[in-house]
Structure formats: C-alpha cells, structure tokens
C-alpha cells in the first residue's frame, strides 16, 4: 500500500527545494496526497477494510494539520501547493 521509491523521488523532485528535501511541508503534503489517492482506489474495492480506513483517516488528519501550518506561515506557498495538487480547500 505504500508508494514506490521512484514515485516518491519524483514527488520530492517536483515539490522539494532540492533533490534531498523530504522534510519541507509541501513535500510532506504531496507525499501524503499521493498515498491517500492510492488508498482511495484500495477502499473502492475493499469496502470492509476498517483497520486500513483508520490509517487513511490518520493520514488525512496529518495532511490537514500540515496544510493549516503552511497556510499560517506562508500563504502564497499554501495556495500554489493546493493548486498544484488539485486539492479543494
């Protein structure tokens, strides 16, 4: 259920400040968004996977907290990040 190393590296390269920037808020948000999108297809097929759904809700909550932090600290970066990811907030 996790992302491949190549996909993670591509996301870090797209959203990070450099190739090894994995800790910035926008990279973490992008990685969580990719994982959430991947899990949504899983739950379309496995409707009774309640343990996995708990993990999904935890990821959504963590992404929401990171988005709130980014909005509070850098509004322009927040707006560009949600536009690039296609999130509605």
From Swiss-Prot:
SMART domains named among the record's database cross-references: Ribosomal_S15
HAMAP family: Ribosomal_uS15_B (MF_01343_B)
Quaternary structure, from the entry: Part of the 30S ribosomal subunit. Forms a bridge to the 50S subunit in the 70S ribosome, contacting the 23S rRNA.
Molecular functions per Gene Ontology: rRNA binding; structural constituent of ribosome
Gene3D superfamilies, A to Z: 6.10.250.3130, S15/NS1, RNA-binding
Lineage of the species this protein comes from: Bacteria, Pseudomonadati, Pseudomonadota, Gammaproteobacteria, Pasteurellales
Taxonomy, superkingdom: Bacteria
Family note: Belongs to the universal ribosomal protein uS15 family.
InterPro entries in the record: Ribosomal_uS15, Ribosomal_uS15_bac-type, uS15_NS1_RNA-bd_sf
NCBIfam families: S15_bact
Protein purpose: One of the primary rRNA binding proteins, it binds directly to 16S rRNA where it helps nucleate assembly of the platform of the 30S subunit by binding and bridging several RNA helices of the 16S rRNA.
GO BP of this protein: translation
Pfam (any one): Ribosomal_S15
Keywords: Ribonucleoprotein, Ribosomal protein, RNA-binding, rRNA-binding
Identification of the protein by name: Small ribosomal subunit protein uS15
Gene Ontology, cellular component aspect: cytosolic small ribosomal subunit
């Amino acid at each position: 259920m996790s992302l491949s190393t190549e996909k993670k590296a591509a996301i870090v390269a797209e959203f990070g400040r450099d190739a090894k920037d994995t800790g910035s808020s926008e990279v973490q948000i992008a990685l969580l968004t990719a994982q959430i999108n991947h899990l949504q297809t899983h739950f379309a097929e496995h409707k009774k996977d309640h343990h996995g759904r708990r993990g999904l809700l935890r990821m959504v909550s963590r992404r929401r907290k990171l988005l709130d932090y980014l909005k509070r600290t850098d509004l322009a970066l927040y707006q560009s990040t949600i536009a690039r990811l296609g999130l509605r907030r």
